[in-house]
């Protein structure tokens, strides 16, 4: 069976996207007519939302709500987001575009301070059993779900219907290939960017895509050899929104889940019936040991915990017991590598015990919840040690028709927050294949709200992509007291309207006060209902105050959508992988021997 998407030349849209955009066009024309704008051909208007954590999530919801209220959202063809804005965009689609309902639900969550820790923990525990478990899973289910107070079980592919019918704009969610970040920093390589839509996932600059339902499955030489279930939106939100802070800050954030005594109780409590054996509860002891080792491998109490565990197991006379006694005796002199090997060995031993109930009968091992939590803590510990994020199978692995060795030699990809590159998804709507005429870019970044313009201008200059010219002096001057909107236009390429969140128009002289009030790493627990309402209000004001400007630019591109000169598509796709056989489409095919979990 031939898959609907594969590695395709990037000089054309994927067929499903092309059909959805075509279906959207009459809806756009109808919306423009309601706005008293006449057009024979629907211009392509894209709305972009930047990263910025929970601040971006709430502010982007405010922007979408006001765009819809003013009748502007119906004239939009593409919605694209980075990091926190992807959370808002995904909410729009899961709620069928009902912005009033989304807004009321958002306020309710923060008024009631709702978040189900146990459900989130169970999701993370189940994810830790996957071969490709990474910190993205932990982050998604225990951090992001807490931030936005929502677990979303639905899949990205489930959002196709309203997109295919043209009811809502076509969504694009941005990520970055972490393994290519060094190339990005040095050369701003195009193939660093990765995108997700309800139909596909892949590298737009390479023209390499896989159906979204097969994202995360194992491919080899273009054939699907092991199918994996489609990941839910909670996981994807964690992948799209993982650039909250620097490494040290994130690491401490994760470790605090296990250091906090209350957190430990949360992990151990639940419907667990501990053994009434004369020896101690081995299951709880092992979990306590793993958590102690995770938070501080040099903790002096670890040796005592090992001694107690050894006594409870009663393994002093067998081979493993002798090994255990030896490592306990020399624990303080043992290398970190050997300590880790022993801990893995210990857990493997316990796993075998579950399978052989005649072994160590005194353990009365609880084979369910506590064991799962031990595995979860230990797998998370390994990921922290290796700092592994966004691990998924590479659908280009060993593909015979891919010339780029870097892209086809890796069995695994590591996808992370696109904010590590540019905090707004300009690179995903600027390629000429999407023929964007007008971009409404809403910036919710911390710090300089013009930095994304600066970074995008540099990126476009390197790759001969049309983008309005901006001078560094001008950007610096604007950043001192940002206006709510800047209109940028060049001789070629789309018109860009860049909106700043906190500006002199809605904050007066208190811009810095507002920025401090809504820090990127600010936890949702510190967001009061008033803070949520205020952020929604100022983000809406930016749209409302600039309605006339937006309509003016819409009118201009609608009057002459062909005014954007054609550019050399090959030049704009300089990093695109070339098929060594020529211009033919490289396809994926399902193997006759597909394994399923």
Curated annotation (Swiss-Prot):
It catalyses: a 1,2-diacyl-sn-glycero-3-phosphocholine + H2O = a 1-acyl-sn-glycero-3-phosphocholine + a fatty acid + H(+); a 1-O-alkyl-2-acyl-sn-glycero-3-phosphocholine + H2O = a 1-O-alkyl-sn-glycero-3-phosphocholine + a fatty acid + H(+); 1,2-dihexadecanoyl-sn-glycero-3-phosphocholine + H2O = 1-hexadecanoyl-sn-glycero-3-phosphocholine + hexadecanoate + H(+); 1-hexadecanoyl-2-(9Z-octadecenoyl)-sn-glycero-3-phosphocholine + H2O = 1-hexadecanoyl-sn-glycero-3-phosphocholine + (9Z)-octadecenoate + H(+). Keywords: Cytoplasm, Cytoskeleton, Hydrolase, Lipid metabolism, Nucleus, Phospholipid metabolism, Transferase. Residues 587-597 have a biased composition (Basic and acidic residues). GO terms for molecular function: calcium-independent phospholipase A2 activity; lysophospholipase activity; O-acyltransferase activity. It is found in: Nucleus, Nucleoplasm; Nucleus envelope; Cytoplasm, Cell cortex; Cytoplasm, Cytoskeleton, Spindle. Its EC number is 3.1.1.4, 3.1.1.5, 2.3.1.-. InterPro entries: Acyl_Trfase/lysoPLipase (IPR016035), LysoPLipase_cat_dom (IPR002642). This is Cytosolic phospholipase A2 gamma. It comes from Mus musculus (Mouse).
